[in-house]
Amino acid sequence: MIKMLQLPFNKKGQVSFDFIIAMLFLLLIFAFMGQNVLNMAKSFRDSETAEHAHAILDSFENYAIMAYSKDVTVNATFEPIGNLNYTIMLSNKSISVNSSTNIIFQPETDANGDYVSIKCNNVDNSVNTIPLNAVRISFGDFTVSKDEMEVNIR
């Protein structure tokens, strides 16, 4: 009679079961790591967009200050950030920047004092609840604001 070779352990399915459990555990770990990487990439993209928005707000304020302090009319061109369109919101206007947009900063005076008038070809004259010395940029998903400008704008 021929005797078959036997494995040194009796639980023949145990090795494959342990291997499956280990692979599932590794898959779970890599899924969590991948989710963290994707969230971090989205956060980087949002922070880069916010940095661009702050730069636009600083430029907007600089043009308004230059028009006010030098008593000159300034014509500035604002463009979308890559393929991101945005809306510049003032106290009584909303300017949609969907393409190259020319904005005119003109110093004016009325009974309430001096201010810088903002004129543009695609202005929506809506009443916003924004103070005269504040500007906001909306990207739809989030809004970046500058609430303490040096000059009043309308």
Swiss-Prot record:
Record key words, sorted: Fimbrium, Secreted
Cellular component, GO, one term: membrane
PTM annotation, UniProt: The N-terminus is cleaved by the prepilin peptidase EppA, which recognizes the class III signal sequence.
Note on domains (UniProt): Contains an amino terminal motif QXSXEXXXL, which is part of a class III signal sequence.
Effect of loss of the gene: Deletion of the gene leads to completely nonpiliated cells.
Keyword Secreted: yes
Cysteine pairs bridged by disulfides in the record: none
Main function: Minor component of the type IV-like pili. Essential for pili formation.
Domain of life: Archaea
Record's protein name: Minor structural pilin EpdC
